[in-house]
Structure formats: C-alpha cells, structure tokens
A protein has these predicted regions:
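Short loop/helix-cap segments at secondary-structure boundaries that form the rim of catalytic
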Residues: 30-36, 48-53
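Short acidic-hydrophobic, aromatic-tinged amphipathic segments that line or gate anion-handling sites
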Residues: 4, 40-42
Length: 98
C-alpha cells in the first residue's frame, strides 16, 4: 500500500497541487470535520464518479486503524486507478498537528 505523510500532504495542499483528497468517513463525520479541500466518498462507487484514472488520489479516514480508507485504496487500485495513496494518520494525525 502506497502511503503519504502529513508533511507531504500539507506540502501538496500548500502548493495547490491538483489532487483528489477523498475522506471515507461517514457523512455526519465528514460534515463535522474534514481536511480542507476534501471530497466526501462513502463508498468506492461514489469515489469513482468523481475520479479519473489519471488523478492523483489520496484517501483517508479517522486514524491509522480505520479500515474504510484501506478498503477504498484496495478497491480503487484493483479497478485500475494507478496513482492512489493512503494518508494513514488520517484526521486524528492532521488535527494533532494543529
């Protein structure tokens, strides 16, 4: 599984790189808090409606133990998306950094 660190993600966001940052939390959780610039995708099928095969895609959920971003990563890569990474630390890591 390809991953991205908080510092790498922050740098991409600061540079306004064209990434698709996908939050796999529930809609209620997403509405309460998410990383700025994220889109809500509660299933891989929903994600695929918003994504192109050439997009740089970063999936995340609540923390390192959250399985939904792992599942989204696996399904997207199996469907042929080539540039997918998982932000393992997720929202907990992002918030901890302030």
């Amino acid at each position: 599984m390809r991953t991205i660190t908080r510092d790498e993600l922050k740098a991409k966001l600061d540079r306004n790189e064209n990434i698709k940052l996908c939050c796999t939390l529930s809609k209620i959780q997403f509405n309460a808090m998410h990383i700025p610039g994220s889109i809500h995708v509660d299933s891989p099928e929903v994600a695929m409606k918003h994504l192109n095969f050439d997009d740089e895609i970063i999936v995340y959920c609540s923390d390192i133990n959250c399985a939904s971003s792992q599942l989204a990563y696996r399904i997207l890569t199996e469907k042929g998306y080539k540039n997918v990474r998982r932000y393992e630390g997720g929202l907990a890591d992002w918030q901890a950094a302030g």
